[in-house]
Structure formats: structure tokens, C-alpha cells
Amino acid sequence: MKIAVEGCCHGELDKIYETIQFLEKKENTKVELLLCCGDFQAVRNEGDMKCMAVPVKYRQMQTFYKYYSGEKKAPILTIFIGGNHEASNYLQELPYGGWVAPNIYYMGYAGVVKYRGVRIGGISGIFKSHDYRKGHFERLPYGKDTVRSAYHVRSIEVFKLKQLKEPMDIFLSHDWPRSIYHYGNKKQLLKKKDFFRQEVEDNTLGSPAASELLLHIQPSYWFSAHLHVKFAAFMQHQTNVDGEIPKATKFLALDKCLPRREFLQIVDVEHDSAKSECLEYDLEWLSVLKATKDLLNITPNTWNMPENNGLHSRWDFSASEETKREVVSDLGHDLKIPCNFSMTTACYDPNNPQYKRVATHIVNPQTTEFCARLGLVDLNAKICQNEEENFDIAEDNEADSIGSAEDPGEYSTDTSVLSTSVNPDEITLEDDDDQEDEGMEDKLGEPSPEYTPDLSINLSKIRVLPDSMAVSSDDATDSTNDELDRSESSQTEGEGKPSNRPLKRISDENGSGGVKIKRRNQAIYQAKDDEDE
């Protein structure tokens, strides 16, 4: 089965589908599935754009709204995970995944699905240690910090994925697993991105949480994006069982959707031709969700996952046969994912733009139905319910505390200040950008003009690199575990302090001179050559 893999989408759906159609004609082949590795930007309207962690001057409506409204339909079944530039308010409606538009499926905070027998898993967001052990507490309206922490990976998702035991064919993450660069051509990578050198040498580039999952899940393929460069690697896993054939993972990271950039690759994946062409739930994953339904935290308080350390009565939440039977019964013996997309808010109208539109809290009926069938908790609805209850309590307390010497103004109830989620890896923004945007009126860029697909797309196979380029996975594991352990204590060591890692450049990536920021909007598609590489 031909599967198209896309790096950072950045809302450029029209261009991505046009490129796939061009390649199908050129190679006389048929692509059956598109996988997007984050920064999808499912922006429906002006309110959604204000929920993306990008400054006003870089906001572009792009083309997703056409697929949301039904003006267009995705020509290929599309599955995506979230990155660090998303309309977080919309994705927050679907914590367990769901359709964001007809034929376009979001995998949720983490998820596993099946298509024609191919098992596909994924985790959304990027790793930041100061938010890793918190719950999903973010709510509308987002603050300066929560608009970023909303897309940070949480330990609960990693814990759930580590309960999986059945083989995985494909896994998606936005940021790279830490240490994966040791299993590929590091010299070539650093030639393209020299400013990664220090982090590669220190083994701090990438996500330790993703690295932990890579060592546990050991999928046949792992696809990522985020760093805006194509990079292939081959990792041979170790086995502790005598006689067991060790597994191997082919890793591929891809660039962002720009002309003359390697942002898309077609791969051949074995599939079961007898299986349905409908997207299906994964039974083991649903069983894990059901088993972990009581592990719930919607506060910024840190918490630790159950371990076999004498402190927890249960630490193994892997899928049991009994739970699997319950799930099958709950779903009426049908694992097909229902095509139950529905619009939950108004769509952008280019003829009548609403610059002052503000995003509001919405409970998505897809999530309501999914949770009702499996007996799960809708995190998004729970946050809304808690806010209403807290509001009622606050009103009662205010009525009872007349004459109190305490000044309520001294006690902030804004939880956003509890998470200073400064992200040095982000593409466009930091404090300077936010200050520059103050007082600016929101302006919406029109969708980019027609685009001619790049004819130089490389369709070569994923490279299998020689063993001499590999390093011991023990070294990688030690580094990963160190940072995951540090994330537990980071709250008391100065939560939210920005790291000293170098900023990820947008252009002038050879490292010469100062950092230059270039907009990834229509001007690039009109007359730009390669982006200073």
C-alpha cells in the first residue's frame, strides 16, 4: 500500500494534495493514505487563529476552512497528530481523536487506529519537562503561557502507550525521539543544520518521552517533523529474550511544506488486502483507555504514574481479554470508526471576515458519543463542568465572606501563570513578538495563490545505514531517563525557566550572521528561491 508521509503541514492542504496528485500521475501509482506529522493547523475561523501560538503578523487562514465547511473534500484519507502550532481549542474538543473535517482524522493527545490491517499509533505535541507531569488543565481563553502548554506532551499519554504489547507498524510524533540522530548520517544532518551540533553532541536534541516510546513500542516505521529537515535513520533494537529476532525501526523526518523542500515522501507498507478500507479503532488501545479511565488529572498539579514501587495497588494497565470483550460489546461488535463529523462552530467567510471573533468553549458531539459508548470521561467537558462548579462555589464564598479582612485581589485564580511554557524550539515567536503584537489589529492573510507542485520531490527509499553509524542504545536510554526524572523535580527548581538551547531558525540556517526570520506566507510561493540553505 502506498502511503504519503508529510512533515509540517502549516495549513497548506491544497498544496499537499496537489503534490500527491502530481506524483500519482508521474509515477502511475495510487496513494491510499496521507499521514501528517504535526503543525497541521486545523483553523476554522478567526477565533481559532487566535488560539495558535504564533504572533498576529504570521497568522494566515490558509485552506483548511474549505475542507471543514464542505467546500472541498480531502481526496485521500488523511490522519494527523498535533504539533506546536495548532488551533489548540479545536483539537482540545477531541482529546481521544475524531474527524476535524470529512475524511480528515485527528489522533487525539495520543491514539492508535488501523487502516487495511496497518496499525498506526501517534502522540501529539512536543516535550517540555516543566509541563510533562501535569494534567491537561488548559482552558479558554488561553493565556500567554497556556496557549503554549496546551500542546505539551503529558506523561499520562506516554504511560498509556507503554501499556501496549501488540506489534506496531507505524508511529507518528512531531518532535524527534532523542538520540535517533546517532542511528543516521549525523555528518550530513549537521551539514544542513549546523546549529544542532551542540545539542547532538550533548545528546539533548529531541524528546526523551518519544525516545522512551521508541524503545518500548519498536514500530517498523517512525515518522516525525518539527526540525524542518529530512533525515533518515535505521535503529536495530535489542532483545532480552533468547532466540527472539530483534526488531528494527526505520525512522524518517521530513521538512515543512515549501517549494524545493523535502516535505513529502511516498512509502510502501505491507497491508492486508482483505481488510476493509474504512478506518478502524484499535481494540488493544481502546482497552487501555478503558482500563486507565480513572487516571484523570485536569489540574496544573504534578502527578506521577503508577509504578511497581510499593506505593500503588495497581501499575499494570495493559489490555486484558476481559476488557477487550467489554470493548467489543460496547461497540456492538463493530470497530469501524463512525463517519460522524459535524461542524461545531461557524466557518471563515472570506467575503465577510469577522476580525473580532473569539473562540468559545465547545463540547464536541463526537467525543460525547465516544465516551458514552466506552464509559470514558470527556476531559474537555470535565474542565467546563469544574469551572461552572468553581464559579458557583466562588459566588457562595463571596456571599459568606462579607466583612472579611482578606482582599480577594491578592489571590490570583488564573492558572496560566503556573506554567511558564517558553519554547525555544518554536518557529516564530517569543516575548519580543508578543510585545510587538500588542495594540496591533488582527489581520487575516488571504490564502496563498495557486501553487505549482515541486517537480524535484525525492521518492527514494528510506536509507538503511551501516551498523558503524549506530551507537549503543544504552547511552541513549541513560540520557532519556535522566531528563524524564528531572521533569519531576523541575517544578521546585524554577518552573518554566527557558532553556539555553539555541533557537530554531527559520532561514539563514547555515548559522552565519544574526537570526533572520522570514514569513512562510504567500510571498514565499510567489518569487522565492530556496530558503537560504
Curated annotation (Swiss-Prot):
GO terms for biological process: mRNA splicing, via spliceosome; RNA splicing, via transesterification reactions. It is found in: Nucleus. Residues 483-498 have a biased composition (Basic and acidic residues). A divalent metal cation 1 binds at residues 8, 10, 228. Coiled coil: none annotated. Its cofactor is Fe(2+); Zn(2+); Mn(2+). Pfam families: DBR1 (PF05011), Metallophos (PF00149). InterPro entries: Calcineurin-like_PHP_ApaH, DBR1_C, Dbr1_N, Metallo-depent_PP-like. The keyword Hydrolase applies. Belongs to the lariat debranching enzyme family. This is Lariat debranching enzyme B. It comes from Xenopus laevis (African clawed frog). The gene is dbr1-b.
